[in-house]
Structures are given as C-alpha cells and as structure tokens.
Amino acid sequence: GQHIDSLEWMSDETKAKAHEKLNNFYVKIGYPDKWRDYTGLTVNPKDSYYANIRRAAEFETLYSLKDEGKPVDKTKWYMSPQTVNAYYNPSSNEICFPAGILQPPFFNFDADDAVNYGAIGVVIGHEMTHGFDDQGRQFDKDGNLNDWWTSADAEQFTKRAEILASQYDNIVVLDTVHANGHFTLGENIADHGGLRIAYTCLLYTSPSPRDS
C-alpha cells in the first residue's frame, strides 16, 4: 500500500480506489479446499500421445462449459497445486500460489531472508503488481471491467508505461533483432513492481540489510 501512497502523480481519488482493490485481493495458497473430480478422464498408456491429449482437451472444455450460466465460484482454482507457477486473475481479482512453487529454489525455510524475498517474494510482488499493470488496472476490486481511474491519472500511467516499453524496445536480442517492450509491457511492469515490493519487505525484516 505504501507504494501506492508514494506515487506523486496519482490523485487521492485514484489512490483510494487502488487501496480498495489491493485490500480486496482474494488470496489462494497451497491447494484448494475442494478437489476436481477426474473420474471422467481416461488416460490410457496404450493409446497414442495425441489420443490422450485430445481426450484431456475435450474433458477440460466440457468442464469449463459446465460453468455457463452459473454464479462465479471464487473458490475454483485455475492451476493445479503441483504446478511450479503462480497467477493473478483480473476477472476475480485473485492471486494464487500453488504448493509447487512454495519449495526450493523459490522458497526455502532454512534460507536467509534475503534469498526468500529475492525468490518467492519477487513472485508474490509480481502477481500483486499485475492487478495494476496495463491490463489489470482496467478491472475494479470485484473483477469487473470498470474504469476506476481519473482521466488525468490514466494519462500519467500511459505516459510512464510508454517510457518503460521504450526501454525494453532498445534491448538487442540478437544482431538487429530488438525486444518488443509493448508486447511484454504487463510482465515488465510486474517484474519491476515485484522487485520493489520484495526489497521493501526485506528492509522491514532486516535491521541492516545493506550491511548483510
């Protein structure tokens, strides 16, 4: 929240909305309270890889179609617990960290604080920042596509986002091939935000982090 408050270019009105959204994050950690039923999915080692993948894709599609016309289930996970990844879902304003990523090298109970903040801390901050990047900022605290920014603040955000995109545009990948800063803008914003959040948390944890 203090990073929001430190934005000199953002109005108090938009800051208040940003705080509302941040405070309304739905956090999922480890594994869901209820598990998916996979009894309808047949995985046959005697079949071809294609046949198994096709059945899995059909099973997943039918599973998704069952939600049509029903109220949104906020307890539903869109990633399995064993997946080494994390996500932010703007349409439900949720952040999810499966059990798979809560282990080395991302999190180690015996590691130094700096190691964990530099690993899982950055990941957590990255996903949180997605709620306020060029895509996530278009959704409100309830996950609705709703413009909660003042026009002046939106203009200031776009101006700064363009600077970041241009910075990445100048990265040479190979010979004359450059990175596309606009294509990766959301991830770049989230990376920068994740680093700032993790480092700020480390400062509060360690009495003298600069000396360690």
Which ranges hold each PLM region?
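Intrinsically disordered, low-complexity linker/terminal regions across diverse proteins
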Residues: G1-S206, S212
